[in-house]
Amino acid sequence: MLARTFLGMAISAFLASTGVQAAWSSNGPNVMYYWGQNSAGGSNTQASLGTYCESGQVDAVLLSFLHVFNVGGTPEINLSSACAGTYFPNTQLLSCPAVGADIKKCQDKGVKVILSLGGAAGVYGFTSDAQGQQFAQTIWNLFGGGSSDTRPFGDAVIDGVDLDIEGGASTGYAAFVNALRQKFSSNFLIGAAPQCPFPDAILGSVLNSASFDYVNVQFYNNYCSATGSSFNFDTWDNWAKTTSPNKNVKIMFTIPGSPTAAGSGYVPMSTLQTIVPSLASEYSSYGGVSVWDASQAWNNGDFSSQLYSLVHSGGSTPPPSSSTIKTTTKATTTSTKTTTTAAPTATSAPGSCPVANQSCSTQNQYACTADGKYAVCDHGKWVVSSCPSGTVCIPTTDGTSIYCGYATGSGSTCPSASALEIAAASFGSKNGPVPRPYKASKVAAQLAVTSTDKNSFEAVINARRTTLTPFEKSVTIEFTTPSNIKFTESDMGPVRQVGNKVRIQAKNDYNESMTLVVKVKGSINSGVFVAPSTSAWKFK
């Protein structure tokens, strides 16, 4: 309670000294935050909804999440500690009057409040268009202008709905969106949160057949994160202009709010200061920045204040103010990634590709060649080698190294550049091959190789259910790896490898979830990291 009181005093002082007033703009750019899940995990790391709206650093807040649809019955919401324990009689639906009061407070300040549906945990989806239409009526009655005895936020009315559909099937969502359009006013916002691989495994067809106001593309936990050479904002911009039913749809650059907010893809402010102005100047569909989530960003130094200034000033970021708002520092500890001194850095200048026997300056520097091979700087000369059959050279998601992987598409993946060099280059020029999806029964997955060095690697397995049946508490992942690669650990449970057969016993953070994000590590016995085969993956 003391921490919250101090926080409120700090905000009041900040607003008094600056007079900052955030407000949503239909033309953008805007800054949006997911709020409710307290993913930072501390007892005081998430402030009240109204606190963030009063900060002057937020244009829209996404209430996260309505995670159980229960079509035909009463849905369920989960806002972590912001609303817990008080249910409507004979239901599992929370009553959250304090959140309802804060919704009105936010709206009075011009901040949009949007209800996000789905998320990683929970059970959701439709079996028919009729169910989608029926659920739109439920949203109208419980959160819109309709009436019900079980309105979680009282008479507060939300400003929009966000589809953060991490798993399941696409059935019914277009009908749901179209039904919402008929019930709510024309300024009601409807958005979606696809992952960056295009098209999205779940929402791809929905985005092509229904009208959305914005799309929060998740540029993290995948190969297409912003710091890698496969950053594909240009692909989403092209979709917005050529395929989207709403040609004025805004593409939001959605990122983690701190290094611990996602398995991979965090972008430091020094790099954002290059990327954000480039996006704003190059793509007319750019709508601003969305962040997962508020608890992470507000416990990451001056991230939130610097980001708001960056987005709304066209790129210049002033020094941190002494009145910058912060929540109490998270009490729990997290592991910090370490790198070895033998990392195969990839710092070739944009536009240049290694050629065999040409000179190079950095011993053990690795890079991709123009024809999909990989080069190693060995005693001042490039030594070029072919990737194993069926694979090509692909840069890692952190932009500092390379690996050999199975890919779709064609073209050059060189040069592998540093994150800052990638950001400075033209985003529209990256048309090379991208990692091929991993498919298993009822699961779509991606393996994002985060980093490699001469002896080790780190990667993220991002798995999504493609049916309405969620992952359970314990999930066994099995696949085959090349003979030079040894998987040794994961952040979700023990790893066992016999020969080239790998088994991960993942302990899900949730009893039921539509997605799994598993961080893995291992060793490289010789050569470079080679990705596992895309076939014969099993999730049990």
UniProtKB/Swiss-Prot annotation:
GO annotation terms (biological process): chitin catabolic process; polysaccharide catabolic process
Keywords: Carbohydrate metabolism, Chitin degradation, Chitin-binding, Glycoprotein, Glycosidase, Hydrolase, Polysaccharide degradation, Secreted, Signal, Zymogen
Residue span of region Chitin-binding, high affinity: 353-404
Its EC number(s): 3.2.1.14
GO cellular component term of the entry, any: extracellular region
Active site: 166 (proton donor)
PROSITE patterns: GH18_1, GH18_2
Catalysis: reaction(s): Random endo-hydrolysis of N-acetyl-beta-D-glucosaminide (1->4)-beta-linkages in chitin and chitodextrins
Ranges for domain GH18: 29-314
Amino acid composition bias (Low complexity), ranges on this chain: 322-348
Cited Pfam families: CBM_19, Glyco_hydro_18
Residue ranges of the region described as Disordered: 314-348
Keyword ATP-binding: no
Role description: Probably involved in the apical growth and branching of fungal hyphae.
Official protein name in the record: Chitinase 1
Lineage: Eukaryota, Fungi, Fungi incertae sedis, Mucoromycota, Mucoromycotina
Name of the encoding gene: CHI1
